[in-house]
């Protein structure tokens, strides 16, 4: 972990002008263990998440960083990209407006920034896909949720629903009871 975090710190200082604090490194280390960490606004959650995501990606994991909205996904992805590039890690940002063909390619990156809502809808669309080729997501095994409390408590009350035509036609006559 020390070597990867050190490489992240060097890239962060060189390309972003940011030197991580001990608290950020501790929080990043906790994230790599699947633990929740609480950080207030302005304490460097974005950098912390990038360090944890980099560590996991360098160790063979496919990482999703879930944000609250498209603005944060785009901002954080673009801001942290120099760190990922310096470490040879592929990254992408999927927005609500991203078309299906582009999503398929973007999901192949080691680190993907996306809103929790969009990731949820992609999961549902893949679940009802007629063929494996119709699926857009790739497997991932590590997730970092920015604003986890908001996503898991506030947004959990809003269901994700997909509606549309199905390949299966309903019976014209219902059996008599």
Where are these regions (language model features)?
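Conserved P-loop NTPase motor core
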Residues: 1-177
């Amino acid at each position: 972990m020390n070597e990867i975090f050190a490489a992240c710190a060097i890239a962060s200082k060189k390309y972003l002008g940011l030197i991580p604090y001990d608290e950020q490194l501790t929080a990043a280390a906790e994230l790599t263990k699947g633990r929740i960490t609480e950080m207030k606004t302005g304490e460097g959650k974005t950098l912390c998440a990038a360090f944890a995501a980099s560590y996991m990606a360098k160790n063979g994991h496919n990482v999703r960083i879930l944000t609250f909205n498209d603005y944060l996904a785009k901002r954080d992805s673009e801001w942290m990209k120099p760190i990922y590039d310096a470490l040879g890690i592929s990254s992408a940002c999927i927005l609500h407006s991203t078309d299906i063909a582009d999503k398929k390619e973007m999901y192949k990156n080691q680190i993907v920034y996306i809103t929790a809502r969009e990731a949820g809808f992609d999961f549902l669309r893949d679940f009802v896909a007629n063929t494996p080729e119709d699926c857009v997501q790739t497997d991932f095994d590590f997730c970092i949720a920015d604003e986890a409390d908001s996503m898991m408590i506030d947004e959990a009350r809003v269901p994700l629903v997909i509606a549309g035509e199905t390949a299966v036609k309903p019976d014209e006559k219902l059996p008599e009871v």
